[in-house]
């Protein structure tokens, strides 16, 4: 939902280390955010989304974990390569505006 870097400023992660940080996540383009929101609404309308979760307090790792709590028989097959972030701490703990969408196996949601 945002093309901003995976910043850690203001995050729960930095707070747990006793700091605040100086680089904070932001929505750099309101137009991009609106188009991303519209695309998600289209996927929901097409019945391709089974569940979704916002990335907020705790970052991506927290959103992913919270999505598994409802069913202890479920698992995840994840690839973060398309996100373009090599720093795994930034990737997992940044609280940048984002969504995690759950789809059925084999469903293609984007081109």
PLM feature spans:
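Mobile "lid/hinge" segments at catalytic clefts and subdomain interfaces of large enzymes
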Residues: 1-27, 41, 105
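Glycine-/charge-enriched secondary-structure boundary and capping motifs
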Residues: 22-25, 32-111
């Amino acid at each position: 939902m945002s093309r901003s870097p995976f910043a850690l400023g203001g995050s729960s992660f930095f707070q747990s280390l006793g700091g605040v940080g100086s680089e904070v996540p932001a929505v750099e383009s309101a137009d991009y955010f609106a188009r991303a929101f519209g695309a998600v609404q289209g996927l929901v309308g097409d019945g391709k989304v089974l569940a979704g979760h916002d990335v907020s307090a705790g970052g991506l790792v927290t959103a992913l974990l919270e999505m598994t709590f409802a069913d202890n028989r479920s698992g995840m097959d994840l690839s973060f390569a398309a996100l373009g972030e090599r720093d795994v701490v930034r990737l997992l703990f940044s609280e940048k505006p984002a969504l995690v969408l759950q789809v059925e196996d084999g469903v293609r949601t984007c081109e």
